[in-house]
């Protein structure tokens, strides 16, 4: 009887676990058109086993004894993120920035000072001349006279008697402003951040990641997460990718793979459900034997 109860428990663990797997797959499919989205995948592992007999080494009078163990079900072993690059799509807006290669944009919430990184370069200029993302978080980089200050990417002041006509970004992240008098100036540089362990980054929604310190920011001061002047966070340097203005990175979700995983996970869920049904039927038969 206890074995059948254990079988029921295994079936229940399968339903709970594979439901979570279906949630992961469903979230990937739902974000197939989300800029900068990184797909996730679920991994499964067995739960603690009931040891019926422990193994024993061979001796002069007996051969070795194999262990006997009964599994108790399945559990979610972990959820991992696929950080591979998605395709770059042209948008026609110069403030949209894609990264061809490694690196993340660094954005900051000016309200509470929280910082995040993202691969979603859907940026715009706000009414204060700040380069911001869709949530209004400010893009960080080099700014100020001689580009010697780390802070918000901010439009510069046009020359006396001139007006700002257009803004462009080169592959190194330099912000080049063009004025009505025919002059131009490099006023900012968008920087990128790379990590020694991307798997430590935490999804926060809105295509943002936190957990930068745990991920090991390359070039940051010890115990902090901030760009450092002259430490090689420029796009195209030290293994970082280049900036592609007028593009955004698409989701890296592979629909073919997701639908395949959906089918296999659904079958696993159905098998767990069937296990519960069969165990219940056997228990009912046993109860009826006592009548």
Range-by-range predicted roles:
Residues 1-144, 158-291:
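Amphipathic alpha-helical polymerization modules
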